[in-house]
Each structure stands twice: as C-alpha cells, then as structure tokens.
Amino acid sequence: MRSDMIKKGDHQAPARSLLHATGALKSPTDMNKPFVAICNSYIDIVPGHVHLRELADIAKEAIREAGAIPFEFNTIGVDDGIAMGHIGMRYSLPSREIIADAAETVINAHWFDGVFYIPNCDKITPGMILAAMRTNVPAIFCSGGPMKAGLSAHGKALTLSSMFEAVGAFKEGSISKEEFLDMEQNACPTCGSCAGMFTANSMNCLMEVLGLALPYNGTALAVSDQRREMIRQAAFKLVENIKNDLKPRDIVTREAIDDAFALDMAMGGSTNTVLHTLAIANEAGIDYDLERINAIAKRTPYLSKIAPSSSYSMHDVHEAGGVPAIINELMKKDGTLHPDRITVTGKTLRENNEGKEIKNFDVIHPLDAPYDAQGGLSILFGNIAPKGAVIKVGGVDPSIKTFTRKAICFNSHDEAVEAIDNRTVRAGHVVVIRYEGPKGGPGMPEMLAPTSSIVGRGLGKDVALITDGRFSGATRGIAVGHISPEAASGGPIALIEDGDEITIDLTNRTLNVNQPEDVLARRRESLTPFKAKVKTGYLARYTALVTSANTGGVMQVPENLI
C-alpha cells in the first residue's frame, strides 16, 4: 500500500505514535488497512458547501464499513456570487490553483492510498480534479448537489441569475421594490450549488461523463436522501478501486475530455467549463486543440436548455432522467461519445447509462427534436482572437446568427458597468472589456454584472459584449469571453478603438474587427506595455505565472527558471 511509507518499519514508530494520537485508529489491525483522505470543502459562507460537513461524516462511516481508515482535511472555497463585482472576484479563478496545490500537498505529504473528494461550487470542483490528475491516486468525487429552485410570490421560478438580472430590471424601473425584495428573499431557498446550469452544476455534470463520479452526481438535490446514499455508495466504490488500483489518469483520457465537451454541448453548459476542462487536460498531460471543441459541437445536438437559458432547474433535469438520460440519448447517435471507456464505477460509460430513458421531453429533448442540431458552446477565431474565444450560443437568441456593430471600449469591468448603468452604452454597441484576463485582471474576473445589466435593461438582442475576462454560468446574451491572447499579453483586443466595426459570426465561428492589418499594425506600435496591477501577495505571484485562457489559465513556471 502507498501508505506503508508512513506506517511500516521500526523507523516509522514516531509516525505511528502521531497516527495513534489522532484517534482514527480504533484497533491494532487498523494500521494494516488503506488510509483514505476525505478532501472536503466545507465552509460557512458558501451555501453550496454549508452541508458538506454532514456529507463527510457519512463518507467516513462508509469508508470504515468498507474496510479502510478515513482522514478528513479541508480546502478553501470562494463563492463567486458573493465575490462578484468587486476585488473579491480577482481571487475566484486563482483559488482553483490554491485548492489544487493544497490537496496535492496533503495527499502526497501523508501518502494516502485513495482520496474521496467532496466539492460543489465553481472553482472547488475543478481545483480538486486538477489535484486528482496531479497526484494520480485512486479517487472518487461526490459533489454536494444543487439547491432547489426558488419561487417568487407570483409563482415564477427563480435562480441566482434571476436575481442578477433583477438588479438591472429594478434600475430600469420595470419591477417594483416589493418584487425586487421578494426575489432576493426567495431566489436561493436551500443549501446546494445554484439551481441552474451555471459553472458549479456544469462541472458536477461533466464529472459523470468524465467517469470520476457516480451517475446522477450532477443533478440529485443537495437536500435529498439520494445525495446521502450516493455518498455511501461512492465510499464503497472508492475502497474497491483502491484494491484494484484504478487511478484518475486511467479514466480521464483524451476521449473522456471529448465526451465532457459533448455533454457540455448537449446541456448548454457554462463557458467556464471550457477553461476548466482545458486545465484538466493540461494537468493530465493531454495536448488538447481548441479546434477539436468545434468539431464536437458540430456533431453534438443541443438537447437540454436549462436556466439561465430557460426556466428549467437542475431538479427538473433530474426528474426528467438526469445526465444518464442525456448520455443514453447521445449514445444513440454513432460517433458522438466514446461509450466503452472505463469509469470510476469499474464499468464503462455505456454500462453506467444504457437504457436510462428520458422521462420528460419538454426538459430533455430527444435526438429527433433537439433545440439545435449543434451544441450550445462555440469557439470563435479571428483577428481579435487568434488563439480562440468562447461563446455560449445556447444563451443567444436563436434569431441572431451574425452581429455587426460599433465598438465601445473599456479597460476595466468597473468602467463598463458605470457606462451601462448611466446609459452611455446603447443599442447598436459591442461593449469591449479588456485587461481583465488571467494576467490583466488579475484573475480573469467574471463579467456577470455588465451582461446582466444589459439583459435586465432589455438590450440582450441589441448589445454584444466581448472580453478577455470570463463569464458566470448565469450569463446569457451575445457574450464572447476568454479572448486569447489577452490584452495584458499584447493580444489584438488591446488594439480595438471606439467606433471600430466588430463582427460576431456564429455560423462561421469567427470574431473580427473590420480594420485593415496595416491599421492594426500601426496601433500596435503605439501600444503601451502592460504593467501588473498587483505587486504583492498571492495575486502578484499568480500574475507572474498564469497562462492565457486557451490553455486553461493554469500557472506554469517559465522553462528558463526550471
């Protein structure tokens, strides 16, 4: 066993003394059992994580029952909704790297035989997956689950995205103060990740198709008995996988990454999943070309439109058959998935999901009646984004295939929000927000406030927004993010000027500023070099080491320093 490194031999008597002091070893034979880490992310200020202490206790009991010894440790967590719109958002994406580093540190320092990961919200899930790829110790994931959708006094279904858009609607005067406060009180009624197909739930669904979690991980409610039983079953399966030495890198292959993007296309997931899945591929040693994502989009139908793109919540998806029903439907179209891959269940993706039929065709459409013949995400290329950009086409009004309007440029999120709120931004604009990428932000903050204000003011079909920053999973509208290279790295988005004509072509997947190359070249000659905004602390180190969005925004030490 891997843990023999810390518990076998006379020279490890001091380590054994410390292990006895933890109280985790209940009998003399316990030292001969596998040691299992429970990597938890319980935190009081994140509603998606307030219940995870209880879930960890269930996991501990089941791990003991299965014949192993559990040891729990905790990671940090950032609630993107609470951190939104201020300096706190600069820490959100960088927290992913801290989580990965922290988990790697504890797992490798103590030579655990296996790891039971309990994530839930936006950066915690991918951070833990990065750690699993890095350490490559037998592992299983069981998330905390989504919250119930809210309900307004008028019977309208609510999610957190409803609340963000309500801010713009209230400023516009289209809803009353009473309605506004009612929504605030009822948008998030229980613990769990936010109820729509936002980043947290997107990643928790993708873990099912990646093969790292049990079926229904992405949709079973946080408050359900099914969630608690899933924790128990996952614990039993992990101990079995430790004995069989089934490791994360055996499961997460290039084909698994393909299938993760295919499910994302079918469910119209968050654009952040592109960033995180590319980072996972990078950590797994898989060279993954962005063009591959568009090829997947072309062959994958869009089957389930979930909030913020509709009024359906994750619970509605669960009742309609969950991710297994979507996977089963996709498997009926040859070449869409790679169903004979091994998963954490010890069975193939096909064996896990075959025969799981759709129970509600309004929530999950069948292959012969998709929302769209192609997937809900697209990678755009062009002279603004030579290394790619991402748009959630599933969140764009279906009537819009191309959009050509005049640029109005801002060098920060805050400048753009002020201009939208004071009506400087009008119908016919393409809002350009730059110097908000991984280096520029720093931390690639989410642009939910400006996109929500645009939609809330009724301009969702008349104003586009492009940025080297990123979006919340709650974003909808004509919103292009992750533009690479970013402005801080000298990317062409830095060369756009007010009044330039910009074309977003969703059919041909292009993003261009309609200026001759010689004009752009002259502008580049006068471009002021970027200077880091933060000089001290973690964000300064992050700025120095982070890469562009097209590689997942991972931190890499320059080769000349290794």
From Swiss-Prot:
Chain positions recorded as Mg(2+) binding sites: 80, 122-123, 446
Record PTM N6-carboxylysine, positions in chain: 123
Reported cofactor(s): [2Fe-2S] cluster; Mg(2+)
InterPro entries, alphabetized: Dihydro-acid_dehy_C, DihydroxyA_deHydtase, DiOHA_6PGluconate_deHydtase_CS, ILV_EDD_C, ILV_EDD_N, IlvD/EDD_N
Any one Gene Ontology molecular-function term assigned to this protein's record: dihydroxy-acid dehydratase activity
Catalytic reaction equation(s): (2R)-2,3-dihydroxy-3-methylbutanoate = 3-methyl-2-oxobutanoate + H2O; (2R,3R)-2,3-dihydroxy-3-methylpentanoate = (S)-3-methyl-2-oxopentanoate + H2O
PROSITE patterns named in the record: ILVD_EDD_1, ILVD_EDD_2
Active-site feature positions: 472
Class in the EC hierarchy, top level: lyase
Gene Ontology process terms (BP): isoleucine biosynthetic process; L-valine biosynthetic process
Source organism, top-level taxon: Bacteria
Keywords on record: 2Fe-2S, Amino-acid biosynthesis, Branched-chain amino acid biosynthesis, Iron, Iron-sulfur, Lyase, Magnesium, Metal-binding
Known EC number: 4.2.1.9
Cofactor note: Binds 1 [2Fe-2S] cluster per subunit. This cluster acts as a Lewis acid cofactor.
Residue positions binding [2Fe-2S] cluster: 121, 194
Pathway note: Amino-acid biosynthesis; L-isoleucine biosynthesis; L-isoleucine from 2-oxobutanoate: step 3/4; Amino-acid biosynthesis; L-valine biosynthesis; L-valine from pyruvate: step 3/4
GO cellular-component term (any): cytosol
Family of this protein: Belongs to the IlvD/Edd family.
Job of this protein: Functions in the biosynthesis of branched-chain amino acids. Catalyzes the dehydration of (2R,3R)-2,3-dihydroxy-3-methylpentanoate (2,3-dihydroxy-3-methylvalerate) into 2-oxo-3-methylpentanoate (2-oxo-3-methylvalerate) and of (2R)-2,3-dihydroxy-3-methylbutanoate (2,3-dihydroxyisovalerate) into 2-oxo-3-methylbutanoate (2-oxoisovalerate), the penultimate precursor to L-isoleucine and L-valine, respectively.
Self-association and partners: Homodimer.
Name this protein carries in UniProt: Dihydroxy-acid dehydratase
Lineage: Bacteria, Bacillati, Bacillota, Bacilli, Bacillales
Gene: ilvD
